[in-house]
Design a protein with these regions (language model features):
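Conserved structural motif at the start of ABC-family nucleotide-binding domains
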Residues: 2-4, 17
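Short coil-to-beta microelement around the adenine-binding A-loop and adjacent beta1/P-loop entry
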Residues: 14-15, 106, 214
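The feature captures the beta-strand-to-loop junction immediately N-terminal to the Walker
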Residues: 33-35
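ABC ATPase NBD Q-loop/coupling interface
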Residues: 59-66, 73-81, 93-107, 175
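ABC-family P-loop ATPase nucleotide-binding domains
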Residues: 98, 105, 110-197
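Walker B catalytic motif
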Residues: 200-204, 211
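Conserved beta-strand-loop-alpha-helix hinge in the C-terminal portion
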Residues: 248, 252, 256-279
Length: 279
């Protein structure tokens, strides 16, 4: 689904990613752990297309899958950006897209979701308005008609109920006045409505208490633990991985993946730290 090869990126004149290589297949959950300044958040920003992060080398190929409502996530992309890529698993007819050639909104429409460490507030824009516009923009990109208000509200209510979130919160401005836990819960509702193929979650456990962590972990599992989806979890701590069991754990240090293992590697990092393993 995602193939990152020898990725190099800078912020300003400072190299941050220095030859990072990583592959995710459908149905897999990968966790990236590492010390501060290793490049974890930079990786998420580069994949999401955030301005100010310059890719200076390498490639990122992405094979999206069709959405739950149907439609082709690559329907409106130029043919020059879509090609078959034998490195990526999936249907023989799936097209791989050069992710780095897409604008941020095109990456989202192709099936990528980026969860933020600190979800932003958007005064004056209600959650319902924001999410309906986002979902219908994706549907347009896939060559589908927009959802009516009633059709959208049915999906939104189902996702809010699944997260134990009062639907009235979706009528409020996006994240305005929300606690840290409410913002992360709201982000899970957003992810459930958007229904991405690939979720990149940057320290989504930051600032959560045990109860909120369990709710968020359950949300990730419910929405994303499926054979046609994949997750890249970026975290400092083992505790989120108690609820979202990874298939692979990677150590990111000095801009590169320096070690890969199973879930037991996270326990080793929690016990011993990064000093020996990051070398």
């Amino acid at each position: 689904m995602l193939s990152i090869e020898n990725l190099h990126a800078t912020v300003g004149d400072k190299p941050i990613l220095k030859g990072l290589t990583l592959s995710l297949n459908p149905g897999e959950i990968h966790a990236i752990m590492g010390p501060n300044g290793a490049g974890k958040s930079t990786l998420s920003y580069v994949l999401g297309g955030r301005p100010g992060y310059e890719v200076t080398g390498g490639s990122v190929m992405f094979t999206p899958r069709h959405s739950r409502e149907g439609g082709n996530p690559l329907a409106t992309l130029p043919d020059t950006l879509v090609r078959m890529d034998p490195r990526l698993r999936g249907d023989d007819e799936s097209g791989a897209v050069d992710l780095l050639a897409l604008a941020p909104h095109e990456r989202a429409a192709a099936g990528l979701f980026l969860g933020f460490q600190y979800p932003v507030e958007i005064p004056g824009v209600s959650n319902v308005q924001f999410l309906r516009e986002a979902l219908n923009a994706q549907r347009k990109h896939r060559g589908q008609p927009p959802l009516s208000g009633g059709e959208f509200l049915k999906i939104a209510r189902a996702q809010a109920d699944a997260m134990g979130m009062d639907f009235d919160m979706l009528k409020r401005p996006v994240n305005v006045g929300f606690s840290g836990g409410e913002k992360k819960r709201n982000e899970m509702v957003q992810m459930g409505i958007i229904d991405p193929a690939l979720a990149i979650l940057d320290e989504t456990d930051s600032g959560l208490d045990i109860d909120a962590l369990r709710v968020v972990g359950d949300g990730i599992n419910r929405i994303m633990r499926k054979p046609d989806k994949a997750v890249l979890l970026i975290t400092h701590y083992q505790r989120l991985l108690d609820y979202v069991k990874p298939d692979f754990v990677h150590v990111l240090a000095d801009g590169r993946i320096t070690r890969t293992g199973g879930a037991e590697l996270a326990l080793e990092l929690e016990r011993d730290g990064y000093k020996e393993l990051a070398a």
